[in-house]
Amino acid sequence: MRLDRLHIQNFRCYEDATFDFQPGFNLVVGVNGSGNTSLLQAVAVSFIELGNAMKPAEISLKNEDIRFVIDRLDGRSRYERQYPLLVHGMGNVFEATEWMMKRDGESFPHLVDSGFGTQIDKIRKQINLAVEVDLPVLVFYRSNRRWQGTGVSAESAAKHRVSRFDGYLNWFDAVADLSEFESWLIGKTLERMQNLLDTKSTSTEFDDELAWVNGAIECAIPKAQNLRYDLRLQSLLIDIDEHKTIPFNELSDGQRGMVALFADIARRMCILNPHMGKDVLKKTPGVVIIDELDIHLHPAWQRSIVPALKKAFPKVQFIAASHSPQIIGSLKPEEVIVLNDGNASHPRVTYGLDSSSVLEEVMDVAQREPEIEKLLSELFSTLE
């Protein structure tokens, strides 16, 4: 599954624009107000019908997705919505190479041309017959994510029954409800304890879904290990720096964000493709959309997060947005999409640049404040 091209008309700030994406990592870069978030929203909207077919939900095009212009006449202002609204995706989703959502007017429902529903019906029948079908991950992480726990009890988690299609729950806003995230982690901890009782094993080495999720976390933070649920404390815990155990909710925003992002993607993959076993993170394809990739992250982690995502989930197409020079400098030019007045282009060079060079070469920002630059220029002129 991948998105190769997206054509949008009258979507938020875009009148008519087309964007091309790489199969691997894509980072959208632009000044505030240039349309970064709107583009990521359009990418997510292009998959609404797929997500709804996988896990029925009340997600559809909204009025705020429709571009409007302000008409002024005799001192009065009118806000006029612009139609048609079009979101046209091209790529590869099961057997579909093109899919479209369109709305021709305010009184018209949105029209869909995708064939996703028919394809998903076939897949459901195959799964019911125990056929091993690979399901792609699809999830959108918005910029307002905080990853605060919700306090799910072990009792409720033990009663929870998971379907493969639960991997798509809340895909359109992955951090809106963390109860599924917590419930799964608690359930897997209880499952591990039950297996130890059944086998009378005393081993502390595990090769289960919880271990695979922790493997993804270690790609992000090498010294972070063993995210699990503690029955006595009734809390999620994680080991940081070998001998330091911290409750998940007491991690810094940056630590919690890194741990939860990698854990949630891995968790969804484990739910979607249990037949893949220990190779599930390496083999699961899909599209993951992340707004403000650098949010709450220390510059060192900003530099390492893209390589870590690529290593942990090599088959996934990432479409993300960021203003971080450290992240931009960790990517090749073809992986960076620079937005300027609604137009997209690739920078001449990015990979390996220091942050100051990225600011100047890619983001068109001076390395120093203008007043300082002027003083330095005068100083050098005097020295000469």
Task: Locate the predicted segments by residue.
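P-loop NTPase switch/coupling surface
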Residues: 1-180, 378
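Aromatic-acidic/polar surface patches that form glycan- and anion
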Residues: 32-33, 78-80, 202, 206, ...
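Short coil/turn segments at secondary-structure boundaries
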Residues: 153-154, 229-232, 371-375
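Switch/communication elements of ASCE P-loop NTPase nucleotide-binding domains
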Residues: 1-55, 216, 230, 234-370
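Amphipathic alpha-helical domain-onset/packing element
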Residues: 135, 179-232
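Charged/polar low-complexity intrinsically disordered segments, enriched in acidic residues
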Residues: 362-384
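Soluble or luminal CAZymes and related metallo-dependent hydrolases
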Residues: 115, 119-122, 205-212, 257, ...
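Solvent-exposed, amphipathic alpha-helical segments
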Residues: 46, 188-191, 268, 375-382
